Amino acid sequence: MRAAARIEAALARLWWRPQPSLGARLLQPLSWLYRIGAALHRLPYRLGWRAAQRAPVPVIVVGNLVAGGAGKTPTVIALVQALQAAGRRPGVISRGYGRQGSELRAVDPASTAAAVGDEPLLIHRRTGAPVWVGRRRGAAALALCGAHPEVDVIVADDGLQHHALARDLQVVVFDDRGAGNGLLLPAGPLRQPVTRHPPVNTHVLYNAPAATIGWPGATAVRGLRGAVRLRDWWGGAGASPGALHALRGRPVTAAAGMAAPQRFFTMLRSAGLTIEPLPLPDHYGFATPPWPAAARDVLLTEKDAVKLPPDADADADARPRLWVVGLDFRLPDDFVAALLDNLRRVQRPQCR
């Protein structure tokens, strides 16, 4: 195991427990320094010394209070689809974590994950919405509006702790791990403290069967849509439940390059599959195949699939067969209705 992976595993053992352990308490002085640094970062905006940039249209920020994944990207995709179904014309901005370079760039069907980031590419592929990536979110919002004047709401992929771009609404996502031991980084997983009540204009979504902290919120509807061969997925084919069910009773390798891969593995086991789990680092690049040479069938998340070319699975009889597993992640109707109601109160025109 690499040194970084060992450190990550050790921190996870400290973070994801109901109460702080002795090891977490020993790290807590560093958490106090982190809290001071975060407060100093926010101070110029709170005192009016620095003004947050306001986009021409409403901005909805989607993010986590905890380090690592809690289901932010599926939430962004589901939110964009819900806005589209309601007649809105959303666009998406993202930093494009893990990509090469930091320049402003539009995501299009010919983009690669290396150039724009795996999550922005997946969001664009799943929703068809215009997506721009850039280190400075304000500049990305202006570039998006300039290129797509029809956009009437911007969804910011991540950025809860970034204050240079003003937000009108925010969606905070928690998974079944909640706030862990309740401490700030590095003693715990929190990027900012969990207050007694959620901030104003905050909608809370639980990527879990029930609420996992004290904030009121909605629970997402989640499941597996099925599986499709990688080459067919790139061709636009949808995931089939039958293809996934056909893998039952066969030895299958399940690979997942995400912050919480066990969630994917658990869903596959719940679907009746016998899997050999292969957890990978978040944003894993797939420069070389990580699965065993003897593997016959490999299941991948869509986030990982965007980093593999179609010809990685070009031969119908190739070994291993690469399957993309689609996630069915939906927002509750009352959650969408409440968010749309708040969005209607924000009086700003389209980008044009």
Which residues are covered by each model-predicted region?
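ATP-dependent carboxylate-amine ligase
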Residues: 1-12, 85-88, 160-352
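A transmembrane-helix-recognition feature enriched in membrane-embedded lipid enzymes
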Residues: 2-58
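A residue-level signal for conserved active-site and pocket-lining positions in enzyme catalytic cores
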Residues: 33, 73, 123, 157, ...
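Walker A (P-loop) phosphate-binding motif
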Residues: 42-109, 349
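Residue-level preference for the first positions of well-ordered beta-strands
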Residues: 59, 91, 130, 152-155, ...
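Gly/Ala-rich phosphate-binding loop of Rossmann-like dinucleotide-binding domains
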Residues: 80, 84, 124, 269
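Phosphate/Mg2+-binding loops and adjacent switch elements
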Residues: 96-215
